[in-house]
Amino acid sequence: MADPYRSNGSAAYDLAAGKLLFCHEIRLDLWQTVRECMTLFPDLTVEVQGLDAHYRFTENPAWDAFSDHNQCAHGLARPGDDLGPFLKFTLYGEFRDVTVASMFDGTPEEVRRMDDAEAQLKARFGGCCEVFRAATRIIDVHAKGVSKNRSARELQQRLGRKILVCMGDAENDISMLEGADWSFCPADGIVADRF
């Protein structure tokens, strides 16, 4: 059986050894970026993903429940806290349920709001970051050039493997699934009809 590895695009981990294999950092000041996003998008939840946890910057019990349900280590960060390398930040719309699948639903107003936020992020950070819609109410921002496919291929190369096998279930997994030698999508995955 293959060793378990996990990658979100910005970082790859060897779960069995409990170690980071590689990461791609955003070349911006973390706290300046957080302040700017919180000012531009006061109605959205801003999250920063570090090596060890996901961090929020305001009290949000719904985000806590979402993170707990999805088994994400998380915490509340304060300005100046050392969150480690700046790997990724995310904007979330309203949390109505604890499942990731629930974030794919949105009212027309929510879709327009997230479209506007995505356009603003691309205009502001597109020169140094990859901005993409992970779900109807989730926008992810990674370092420039980062994608799940690129990271999966980097992991394959580092491990000396000939065949890349990937599994995913959502829109943000499509480039990785299409770029893999073998790909799998659960039958109930959001993009299952494409595979």
Language-model segments: residues:
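Hydrophobic packing residues within well-ordered alpha-helices of enzyme cores
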Residues: 1, 121, 191-193
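Asp-based, Mg2+/Mn2+-dependent phosphohydrolase catalytic module
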Residues: 181-195
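Structured helix-beta-strand junction loops
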Residues: 7, 40, 127-128, 179, ...
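Active-site-proximal flexible loops/turns
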Residues: 15, 176, 180
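Conserved acidic, metal-coordinating active-site core of Asp-based
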Residues: 44-167, 171-176
